[in-house]
Amino acid sequence: MYLPRLYLQRTSHALSRLSRLSRSSSKLCTSQFVLHPTRYFSSSSFPMSSSNTDALVEVAKARRSYYKLGKTSPVSDAKVEELVNNAILYLPSSFNTQSTRVVVVVNDKHDKLWDIAIEQFGNLVKSGAISEDQWNNQTLPKLQGFKAAYGTILFYEDPAHIAPYSEKFAAFKDKFPIWADHANAIHQWFLWAGLESLGFGANLQHYNPVIDTAVAKEFDVPSDWRLISQLVFGSIEGPAGEKQSKPLEERIKFLGGK
């Protein structure tokens, strides 16, 4: 399994810091006032420091798109499930709609997902929507590459949990679906970075809506859930590509600083 030295150094260093922070936060939370059955409040319950911030930044730096993935998992499936559960429990959503949904498929279920994708796109080849050349040289090799990985997280939005807020706050009715996508993106980034901090490589795909109906039927997903993206993860079998960044001056305005 390919693990670049810089990746290992950054991730190991960041995880060590975050582990210490987690233990510290757990001790603090046990003595805090309960404001909600699953929430605790204290101005000191998350003791931020420059070292903790540095650890978070290192996790962000280590997150990359890895496309050459394998079927070896560095952790137990229970550890992956724990990460997903924490994402759903603690990540924010606009107006606390909590409309993000995820379906995690690993092992044979993961293989089935990408078999479905291959079948659905194969139908587009038969109909002439995709050329044989594009299919054989681009689309099929990509889909087979995703199947070669260990698992996939499917990200959905549940409109049923958005509609009541659109009705209650009519002035923002057209904004709630957009804000839901924002919340979904937060979940995507957290789980992408989280999986890579566990030792996986990952890449984010968008093969909806071509696969939506067949996937919903196969995995018993409610038909009204809206598929947003697919996060493919597995053992790192090759390096990530070089990352190009546009100048910060073109992308940031920092005003009123002292």
Q: Which residues are covered by each model-predicted region?
A:
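N-terminal chloroplast transit peptides
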Residues: M1-S25
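A generic local secondary-structure boundary/capping motif
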Residues: P141-Q144, K217-V221
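N-terminal amphipathic, basic helical "cap/leader" segment at the start of enzyme domains
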Residues: Y2-L6, L28-C29, H36-G151, G256-K258
